[in-house]
Structure formats: C-alpha cells, structure tokens
C-alpha cells in the first residue's frame, strides 16, 4: 500500500509539473473575431507610429502569440453573416500567415452563447438529443477539417462558450430540478460529443471547457462535470475586472492556480478586458493582472477579448438587438494599440536566450524569441541589439 501511495504521489506530481510547465510558454492572445466586420465597415488599424498595418501582423508586432476566433453555426439566421465557417477560415489564414497560433471557440449557436443565452441553432431546432450530439460532432469536424486542409491546426479548441448553465438549451441545460448525474447528463453528452470530434480531427489539440466569473470559486463546477463523465484537457475562464480590480485580479489568478492543482490541467484566461474610458488605468489593470496570471502556477495564458475595437464602433446586429457599443476595446480613437496591450508584449527573456547563444548570431528575432524575416517590422532583436523598424 505504501508503495502504491508513493507511486500515486509521484504520478500526480508529474502531471502537475506538466500542467505548470505551461507557464514557461505563457500565451499572450486576443479574440479578434470582429476584425473582418470592422474592416468591411471601413475601420483600419495602425501601429504606434501611425502606419496602417494588417491586424494579425499588428497583433504579432505588439507581442501577441495567439488569436481566438469564435464560430457560429449559421449566423445569417441570427443577425449577420460574420463568424461563420468561411469568415473564420479567412481570419485563421491571416493569423497563420502572421505566425500566430489559433484557438477556435465553438458557440454551437447562430449567435453569442453565454450564461444568459445558449440558444439552439435554428437548423437544429427539431433535433432529438441523439441528433444534437451528431450535429455537434459534425459541425465541429467540418470546421476543423477545413482548417486542417489548409495547414492550420488550432492548438486549442473550446467546446462551448461560457457554459456554466450548460449548452444548446434545452437538451444541454444543466437541470437543477434533478440531482447527481441526471442533472448533468444532457450537458455532458453534448460537450463530450464536441470533445470527441475535436480529437478525431486534431488529436494533439487541447480541448477547453469554458465558464465565466473567474474571481469566483469554480471548483464545484469542474468537480461535478468531471464526476459525471465530462471530458476536458484545459479549463477556460472569463475575467472582466471592475472597480475592485486589484482584488478581482488576485482572486482569478489564485483560482487559476487552485483549479490547475485540483484537476491537473492547465487553466487559460480565454477572455478579459477593462473599460477603455481611462486608457492609463486600463493599462495599469492589465499589467497587474498579467503579472499575477504569469505568477500563478498552471495558468497557461491570457486572451484579451476584442481589443481591436475603437471609436465606439459596434457590429450591425448590436443595433438590431438594442445593445450599446463594447466599451473594453484596447485601441485608441486613432486606431492604434492603447496602454492596455502593453502587458502583452512579453518580457523579452526568450529573445535574450535566442540571441545570447553566439556573438555571431546575425538572425532577427521578434519579442517572443521567434525567428523573423530580415524585412519584418516592429520591435525586433538583430545582431544582439533591439531595433524598431
């Protein structure tokens, strides 16, 4: 028995070490799903010097290492044709060309899925529970296979968006009128259909189950989800700090470390943002949170949600539903990166490691330590010196 306990402890320690190793490869990302609609509306993006720059290239120049792209089933049935498979492919191609990794966020809806709405796609309205599982699997495979066919293999895939109450209502709603496995059965079945579909196409991809309220103690959710058969490789959290941002930042970072420890999987902050009305304060808030997230063992990275929004732009469907403009964009009114994105530039340690191996190293590196072309623009290290082009 003693040998068994020792073996189990060593195994759990190894698993945690693997999960915590993600900190050495801390992901700095952004969900930029609105960019194509913004561009169609005439919006353009500029670097710090005011030069117009393609958004994905600009994200890379800033220091981002990844982008997150949401997928809707048939958005034309809701409020517009953006974020369908074709739109996602177009954005993924651009991200891939810019050297960014990709996270795919399946909403399994024709519009936003979140704790307040997990609306079934119109085309699936009459499906039975079994047909819904097949639809989830089919939709997941279709999008991922299309990406893979173009040489784009997402590193992470979300099966559902902010699914604290479940997904694809009513069949996938967590039924709190029941207890135990019966309450979770519908949600677990649909989530697992997505998980299995991801693995069938991309065996190495990390599958994320994502919920909101990062500062809250969320262990109960994942404890029950796992207990009743739910599968996941990574935990995703949303974190939108408000006036008590220092305390909320600390809580979310602590929760990320706690969840990574309890479930032996890495935790990703897949959404964050702060009000853009005070750019300097937003920069301070994000710097504080990034420092705390990086220090949290098991926290794999942070994605800013729709930082490219500026000038109180809003998508056309916001007018149809009567919503105000998104107020957490991280670009200035001139379309340039604002201070909130300074924290996503990285610390330069990989650059130093890459260029310090040899005094004769004449390669050019970006601020993530990745080889860059001699014609690359932005903040770079070449011949052991930092340059701005």
Model region roles, listed by residue range:
Residues 1-22:
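Bacterial Sec-dependent N-terminal signal peptides
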Residues 22-58:
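Boundary/entry segment of secreted carbohydrate-active catalytic domains
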Residues 30, 59, 105, 157, ...:
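Conserved, mostly hydrophobic/aromatic
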Residues 32-35, 72-74, 107-111, 159-164, ...:
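Active-site beta-loop-alpha junctions enriched in small/polar residues
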Residues 40, 44, 176, 277-288, ...:
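Aromatic-rich peripheral "rim/lid" segments of glycoside hydrolase catalytic domains that contact
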Residues 49, 53-56, 60, 204-206, ...:
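Glycoside hydrolase catalytic-domain groove-lining segments
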Residues 58-206, 212:
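Substrate-binding cleft and catalytic face of glycoside hydrolase catalytic domains
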Residues 350-389:
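C-terminal outer-membrane/trafficking sorting elements
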